Amino acid sequence: MIWWFIVGASFFFAFILIAKDTRTTKKNLPPGPPRLPIIGNLHQLGSKPQRSLFKLSEKYGSLMSLKFGNVSAVVASTPETVKDVLKTFDAECCSRPYMTYPARVTYNFNDLAFSPYSKYWREVRKMTVIELYTAKRVKSFQNVRQEEVASFVDFIKQHASLEKTVNMKQKLVKLSGSVICKVGFGISLEWSKLANTYEEVIQGTMEVVGRFAAADYFPIIGRIIDRITGLHSKCEKVFKEMDSFFDQSIKHHLEDTNIKDDIIGLLLKMEKGETGLGEFQLTRNHTKGILLNVLIAGVDTSGHTVTWVMTHLIKNPRVMKKAQAEVREVIKNKDDITEEDIERLEYLKMVIKETLRINPLVPLLIPREASKYIKIGGYDIPKKTWIYVNIWAVQRNPNVWKDPEVFIPERFMHSEIDYKGVDFELLPFGSGRRMCPGMGLGMALVHLTLINLLYRFDWKLPEGMNIEDVDLEESYGLVCPKKVPLQLIPVLTQWT
């Protein structure tokens, strides 16, 4: 019975939309693939939309029109079109469309990442840039990073002495979570409510906010579809677990007067009016929404990036050997390894860039929404159009990168291209007003962790595995980590 209702309602709304379209002036929209009635191009997305959209762009062009239910969208897939979206028309393309499940997990867009462009968003952005993610504040947390990495190294040593396998993805995500919990929440992950479900909840949140949800593309009927598929219940589950964690962290902070200089402390001062946020008075939901961004951005930037780097290194022994030789030559017998050592490790920096090129953690940026009519590349982009930026396509474009599927760190030798949002051939953290503000905090931990792993240990695969068996498939969500866990055996060395 419910399916007859779904079909009937879908045709009703399709009739309204078609009638509306016939009354509008014909526009010079970008080319795109044929679409089906009602669902448009949703059937062409597949399980990994960034890959499917890349293939479609090879046929239909660098700026491509699509229809997702009742939503009109365009996809930018080359450095030139992406530059138009993120730089030339950054102000006009800076807002966000309403998305059902991001609205829920961000406490009705009280965050930075999903909030529409507004005075509130501008004030939060300014606060994060000036207060949370300055170079000075990132450096102030260096002791926490060093303590947590030292503890992680001790764990690896124990496994090396026993020749035991380490689940690198699991342990690296936990490492980044431990750092973020201390610098952001003043609480130990080990004693928090997320201690046993941390990775599951973080990845679940990313899947929920990154899915192409029916509720976003079909009025009324979409919510019913999401309840049938289980997306709605999954969203509620991860939201409640995350909310409970935030409550615990805030309560702990309020009860322990010894906790100082963390991110919750700053936000609680704003709640009390001790520190300003322009004309806005922060509420508890504002605090939680901002904390969600801090937690997610820090974990995904560092934990999953290091996992991908180690995956490519173990799969490319030549690169591993070269990277370790450089690290050991530069560090030598120095006991006090610091993040600043990365500045002398030119080849390791190339390895990190190449990893971020092949495996951008957010291959399809959060959609933007055109706040007014604009023209890109001679094509009309009507107001309210959803704009997707396919970073995956940009960074695997054969016209930009020779042998784009091959891991070649040397391609960055004598190259000025960097991942900091200026070069549109390499944008793993985005660019413009919506660029990830937590990049510096996350990458500081990436550098410190990798230097320690490569300096102190050699690495090998478990018995019976060859490098051909190392899988490079990614999971899909807003963030795309390695799908199959990376299992490695650490080996003690003279530098351990």
From Swiss-Prot:
The lineage of its organism: Eukaryota, Viridiplantae, Streptophyta, Embryophyta, Tracheophyta. The gene is CYP71B14. InterPro entries: Cyt_P450, Cyt_P450_CS, Cyt_P450_E_grp-I, Cyt_P450_sf. Keywords: Heme, Iron, Membrane, Metal-binding, Monooxygenase, Oxidoreductase, Transmembrane, Transmembrane helix. Heme binds at C436. Coiled coil: none annotated. This is Cytochrome P450 71B14. It is an enzyme of class 1 (oxidoreductase). Its EC number is 1.14.-.-.
